[in-house]
Swiss-Prot record:
It comes from Escherichia coli. This protein is able to protect a cell, which harbors the plasmid ColD-CA23 encoding colicin D, against colicin D. Keywords: Bacteriocin immunity, Plasmid. GO terms for molecular function: toxic substance binding. GO terms for biological process: bacteriocin immunity. InterPro entries: Colicin_D_immunity_dom, Colicin_D_sf. Disulfide bonds: none annotated. This is Colicin-D immunity protein.
Length: 87
């Protein structure tokens, strides 16, 4: 298991190597894989959780609620999260 997989996905997304939809789908899978893992650093765990929450707010449809974000909004949030955790 790659404990950095969520961070790696975020970096792939920011580099435009995967789409926002791929990021939002794959981040959920990686999050599930980390359930019960006890030796994660708090920094990685918290960053992963924030990335997951940002992905949950992503809505590709133009008809989105005011709390939902589009591709560009997701990129801004993901970049901000990685900077916050210095990753």
């Amino acid at each position: 298991m790659n404990k950095m997989a969520m961070i790696d996905l975020a970096k792939l997304f920011l580099a435009s190597k995967i789409t926002a939809i791929e990021f939002s789908e794959r981040i959920c899978v990686e999050r599930r894989r980390l359930y019960g893992v006890k030796d994660l650093s708090p920094n990685i765990l918290n960053c992963g959780e924030e990335l997951f929450m940002a992905a949950e707010r992503f809505e590709p449809d133009a008809d989105r609620a005011n709390y939902e974000i589009d591709d560009n909004g997701l990129k801004v949030e993901v970049r901000s999260i990685l900077e916050k955790f210095k990753l």
